[in-house]
């Protein structure tokens, strides 16, 4: 892994953390994924050799940068969804600053609208958005996740267990899927077809 990338991404993460600490309103905070979780995403994408990646919940693009860093190696294309236009623009600028923007399509969109309309199949999906919508998203996620080797990763399942418990049970109750929780960062829920 490039020491230059690690130094730049760490500095950016520290800026985002300082922003979050200055805001008590949850919706004003950036709420980026933890570095150890982001590093795992990088490894998973490389191991899987992902070609088509979907990120639901761009925020300011910290996780997007990690996805794009891995996408360089696998020649993947990322579509990332963010409902807040300002955050999406900041994420895009961060990708430009890291020279990773060529791997990412930034869409300002309601995730449920996108999921309902898309006909694409993705071999890697990161779900890190407003948790109260996850059960609704599940109506569409199985149709767009590739059946052979596709992986859905959901963040914050340990730190916000009570908020995602219905979603976790909904997925676990579907016999078509294998799941596990990794106690990394805020907790990652991994989902794949059997």
Question: Each predicted region: which residue ranges?
Answer:
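A short alpha-helical cap/connector motif
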Residues: 1-124, 131-153, 157-194
């Amino acid at each position: 892994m490039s020491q230059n990338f690690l130094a730049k991404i760490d500095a950016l993460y520290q800026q985002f953390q300082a922003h979050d600490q200055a805001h008590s309103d949850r919706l004003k905070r950036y709420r980026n994924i933890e570095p150890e979780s982001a590093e795992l995403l990088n490894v998973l994408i490389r191991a899987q050799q992902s070609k088509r990646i979907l990120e639901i919940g761009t925020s300011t693009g910290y996780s997007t940068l990690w996805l794009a860093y891995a996408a360089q190696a696998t020649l993947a294309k990322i579509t990332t969804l963010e409902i807040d236009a300002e955050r999406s623009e900041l994420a895009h600028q961060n990708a430009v600053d890291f020279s990773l923007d060529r791997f990412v399509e930034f869409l300002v969109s309601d995730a449920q609208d996108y999921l309902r309309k898309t006909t694409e199949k993705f071999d890697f999906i990161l779900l890190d958005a407003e948790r109260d919508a996850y059960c609704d998203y599940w109506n569409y996620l199985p149709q767009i996740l590739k059946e052979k080797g596709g992986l859905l990763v959901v963040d914050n399942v340990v730190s916000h267990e009570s908020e995602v418990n219905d979603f976790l049970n909904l997925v676990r109750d579907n016999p078509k899927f294998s799941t596990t929780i990794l106690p990394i960062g805020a907790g990652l829920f991994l989902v794949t077809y059997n």
